[in-house]
């Protein structure tokens, strides 16, 4: 049996294009939600919570990287880590990516 898993919301794909491992990690949590049997909590809500949780993890990781970069004193590392932390902070807000119709329809219709 082939299962068509949902795709990561387009806005997240766009914003994370330089972080393919992050996209893969988001896809993993969506696949888990899609494969999990129905429960009292709607799948769309579970998918949103799963993405928000993983995005929160990305933010925490980016903060750690920023702290490490600051400790190194290397201006290039600091600038790169600040840019990454800023991006992760931005995408953590669901209004940035929740307008993806394909995502919403997939989880509403499953």
Predicted regions and their residues:
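Solenoid-repeat scaffolds in large eukaryotic assemblies
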Residues: 77-81
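Long, non-catalytic architectural segments outside compact domain cores
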Residues: 1-57, 61, 83-110
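Hydrophobic/aromatic side-chain positions at a characteristic register within alpha-helices
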Residues: 66, 70-73
